[in-house]
Amino acid sequence: VQTGLSVRYMYGFQILLDMAQRPNVINLMGNHEAMAIDALSYLSGSKLTSEGEGEKAVKLWFCNGGEVSLLDYLRLDSEQKKVIWGYLLAMPLYKELEVNSRKFLLLHGGLDNFSPERPLEDYAADEILWCRPKPDKTYYSDRYVVFGHTPVQLLTDGKESGLAKIYRNGNAIDIDCGCVFPSGRLGCLCLDTMKDIYV
């Protein structure tokens, strides 16, 4: 939904409105979407959080660029806010797919406290949204786990030179190529071909 104060992030909710109209787009819940839900719930007077937790949620969101997103949200009319709210609340934490006989688990940050025997539905949202896996982290042997949240520049401690590239460690694939960094760019993984695409 947002990151920092850059002009390109001032229209995060406009982008979500566009995405909500596209049946071919599946948006997974990320930590910024979760922060927006918590903060906007509190700011709108919803009783989803206690007062102390609500104030903490707003501070956390604002520390992560939420002020710019709040201004964008406030520009929406009531119908657009309903669409956004429904879209945010419907975002899944993960998506399992099979493409060309390859199994994939797509999620935002990874799986904290991972065990291959642990059912996915037993992971708390925070274990998926805020996970920062180590570079040598592996997950399942029978499927690819594709995630972002941790820019590859941080995952590799900046040891890679040149423009950022999608990071692979066995079946664990980090596609966050750190657009916010000078060496960053948008990294996409084509599940049909397993080829990297960069913008």
Give short role names for the model-derived ranges:
Residues 1, 30-31, 149, 176:
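Active-site glycine-centered loops adjacent to acidic/histidine catalytic or metal-binding residues
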Residues 53, 60-174, 178-184:
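Acidic, His/Gly-enriched loop-helix segments that form or flank divalent-metal centers
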Residues 98-101, 190-195:
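Short acidic-glycine loop/turn motifs at beta-strand connectors
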